[in-house]
Amino acid sequence: MSAEQQAVVSAEQQAVVSAEQPAVVSADQPAVTWTVVVPVKVTSQAKTRLAGDLSPTQRVELVRAMVVDTVAAARATPTVDRVVVVTDDPDVVADLSADEPAGTDAERRADPSAENRASTSAQHPCLRAHLDVVPEPSPAAGLNAAIRAGVASARSGGGLAAVSVAVLLGDLPALRPGDLGAALEAASAHHRAVVTDADGSGTTLLTARSGVELYPAFGPGSAAEHAARGHVVLDVADVPAVSGLRQDVDLARDLAAVAALGPGPRTTEVLDRWARLGEGSSAA
């Protein structure tokens, strides 16, 4: 466990494993909608384990593409109302802003015309959910601090009781709205839930229903740590092994797995261009 995890675990662990609520939510609860928090570190510092396969420029390009595709999938998921991206990277902010249609979010929502709805849906199918970008508290503070800042922003209006939150990592380029929607539906049956990555040791999705605190413990072995903190592990019946939600990218072999699943358009464009130019051949 990292020093950051140790700094918060004792008080949080006691709260999580207490009998404050049953582990399973009553079946007669209304349908759940979610705010998704996506933490994104400065891209020049990301994916260092790919350094032996990709140049620094390629790593930055890949990370930016994966974030765009991951966020687009989240915003296209019907049960997601809002996506909060936590980042200090201006290029990521610019990438996410580039796909926004004309007019403010409020203006688009206020226009009831079928023409406006059809145009927005056809040209910007990822824009069902509202997008907010909030600054990272401090790059030195780490991933879990960024997540806590995003969750605080997500719940700033109505507080803990008002918003169900899901933390989604930004390196899931093969994610589809159906993948995330199915996982969130399964997660809605539990006060806290977790989806593990393809090898079962890491975490790609961490959820907490409204009224429930979320205690992120991302880092090596995070899946086991999150389970110990009271998050129900969603198995392959809920999230299949071949789901894009499980396939994050840390190593070159992960890019091959992503290519087999079919990445989103931005990541596809990057990988296809590298293939044409003969770049990153050991990773693609």
UniProtKB/Swiss-Prot annotation:
Phosphoenolpyruvate binds at T203, G219, S222. GO terms for biological process: F420-0 metabolic process. Residues 105-114 have a biased composition (Basic and acidic residues). Residues 94-123 are annotated as: Disordered. Keywords: GTP-binding, Nucleotide-binding, Nucleotidyltransferase, Transferase. Pathway: Cofactor biosynthesis; coenzyme F420 biosynthesis. It comes from the Bacteria. The keyword Transferase applies. It catalyses: phosphoenolpyruvate + GTP + H(+) = enolpyruvoyl-2-diphospho-5'-guanosine + diphosphate. The keyword Transferase applies. InterPro entries: CofC, Nucleotide-diphossugar_trans. Coiled coil: none annotated. Signal peptide: none annotated. SUPFAM superfamilies: Nucleotide-diphospho-sugar transferases. Its EC number is 2.7.7.105. GO terms for molecular function: GTP binding; phospholactate guanylyltransferase activity. Pfam families: CofC. Belongs to the CofC family. Guanylyltransferase that catalyzes the activation of phosphoenolpyruvate (PEP) as enolpyruvoyl-2-diphospho-5'-guanosine, via the condensation of PEP with GTP. It is involved in the biosynthesis of coenzyme F420, a hydride carrier cofactor. PANTHER family: 2-PHOSPHO-L-LACTATE GUANYLYLTRANSFERASE. NCBIfam families: F420_cofC (TIGR03552). This is Phosphoenolpyruvate guanylyltransferase. It comes from Sanguibacter keddieii (strain ATCC 51767 / DSM 10542 / NCFB 3025 / ST-74).
